[in-house]
Amino acid sequence: MFNRVQKEINQIINRGFDRTLRLAVTGLSRSGKTAFITSLINQLLSINQHSSQNLPLFEAARNGSILAVKRVSQQDLSVPRFDYESNLNDLSQNPPQWFQSTRGVSETRLAIRFQRQSGLLRHLKERGTLYLDIFDYPGEWLLDLPLLNLDFQQWSQEQIKVTTGVRAELAQNWLSMLQNLDLSAVANEDVLAKIAKSYTDYLHQCKAQGMQFIQPGRFVLPSDLEGAPALQFFPLIHLSGEHWQTLKKTAKSNSYFAVLTKRYNYYRNKIVKGFYENYFSTFDRQVILADCLTPLNHSQQAFLDMQMGLNQLFNNFHYGSRNFLHRLFSPQIDRLMFVATKADHITRDQIPNLVSLMRQIVQEGGRHVEFEGIDTEYTAIAAVRTTKQVIVNQQGKEIKAIQGVRSIDKQLITLYPGTVPSKLPKTEFWQKQPHFDFDSFEPQPLEQGESIPHLRMDAVLQFLLSDRFE
């Protein structure tokens, strides 16, 4: 008991004096969270060797405020350590490889030793140490957070809105099984498992079609819950409001309706809420990553799917200004950065368009954030740069292009991907074929001792960390 109280007191003191910064790196599946965290760690550790030469926009590195950076033991010993070394080893292979996708939660802690340049504490303590806690987790789990505000009926009705177009075609099998289910009958475990598997298969098919709004997220990446009854439910999108009310009044406790409701509530209250409280309710700063380019290359529905997923994230984080007392007793996010990833997949002149598009995508969900006095920033980056900018001569004209090793066939190619729309694409954009010539690229070879090549990670570090070294 005493140790727990002492630990909480130490956390409050450290938070109040800015000794600890908890960074939430959030984003939908395939947005590049693991690459972002790996590069962020690498850029900070590289300050020990390369000083500021690779991070010219990061003032604390440029002016010598940061004295040393090292990885240290994390506080929560029950969470796996982020496998930075393995990721770095993948980039050092010949040929280099991309990292394994995230399968569960992991954590890392960096100790950043620095010399204060300003502020009251420079008189009290010449040097300080900032502990930076960073978490990685599957993007699939992130989109379960909106369930915290929805009961089973509300969630089912939300799914009606998205089961259209391509999704409606993919859903035919599980919908036909659902239509034939008597929700008032006594529940059979085998029948529930069979329909839940059909619904899970549907979610996997949506993901394969480029959709990113996948709920429940654990259905496609269950981790240690695979096969558990907690993952064997599905939305009742065929019920009218009147039918819902009738079943709530008349369905017995052992009926399909009651069992499905109970499982949804368990999933929301135990699994999703536990995940949120353990990892998301106490963050100080947040980065929201979005791959805007892949949906542009895919379909209008994939793009709208991504936009809807991002806009649903904002309801589950506490934004607002942070003074000394706030930091002590009410942790909340005070700096928020929206980051468009894979900026190395387009030519340099298209990056302003990509940033503008990112603004457009999040505008509706993020508008209230700006009104609460929180610092917000929009940028485009490549956490791991895979291409180089080149000029090609075509029919006597010089054209900007990119060059890199294409993932699908490992061939070195040079191409102009096209124009990135600066605003939300209209119907005419999707009628063009192709909408956008977007390829995936392999990482560049990483030599021993070199820092990971990047695009604008120093701007990210400047926005997220600079005030802690003043």
UniProtKB/Swiss-Prot annotation:
It catalyses: GTP + H2O = GDP + phosphate + H(+). One of its GO terms (molecular function) is GDP binding. A motif (Walker A motif) lies at residues 27-34. GTP binds at S29, G32, K33, T34, A35, W98, S101, T102, R103, K342, D344, H345, V384. Keywords: GTP-binding, Hydrolase, Nucleotide-binding. Pfam families: DUF463. It comes from the Bacteria. InterPro entries: YcjX-like. Alternates between an inactive form bound to GDP and an active form bound to GTP. Likely activated by a guanine nucleotide-exchange factor (GEF). It is an enzyme of class 3 (hydrolase). GDP binds at G32, K33, T34, A35, W98, S101, T102, K342, D344, H345, A383, V384. Its EC number is 3.6.5.2. To E.coli YcjX. Monomer in solution. Binds GTP and GDP. Has intrinsic GTPase activity. Does not hydrolyze ATP. May act as a transducer of stress responses. PANTHER family: ATPASE, ATPASE-RELATED. This is Ras-like GTPase HI_1637. It comes from Haemophilus influenzae (strain ATCC 51907 / DSM 11121 / KW20 / Rd).
